[in-house]
């Protein structure tokens, strides 16, 4: 019997765990998934005034731990740490994905006017840099509009998913002239249906895009 593909998910907040678990259950239930949570990273990034370089050693250690635990692939679910993930995956023998790269590739296929909605402000700069980098690699010019809804993050931390979803959907009114809306964080996924209804635009979420890319890389014949 073939051993199931083993995927390590590395989180900086517990709020990302449920959305990615649901995506795996729906899109790739055959995968064997395990979680690594290091929830001091977000606070430490703030304490370092956004200095990602201060966290690179820790991201490298988390990646090594995941690979040493038998992971066939690694997915980070924390959007604010792109440069640290880039450094951590250098030389690693298995695929290591940043949370947004698959979603960004999909968005570039859907159009050039793109809205990026975030609820955690430090996510915006690294995700914007990823968009610009991938667009440059694809020789595409994009018009990227960033929208931050910090009140939604606060609501979700208090367990109020309804208010979280409503605030994000409300903010999407600023994106009705865009080709596609992208959510910057895994924790925002529950707001996708309400946002699509409110805006009338396609909405891409990081979990679904990431699972689809991992499945393509590691189990291409299972579709």
Task: Walk through the language-model features, giving the residues of each.
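Non-catalytic structural scaffold of enzyme domains
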Residues: 1-223
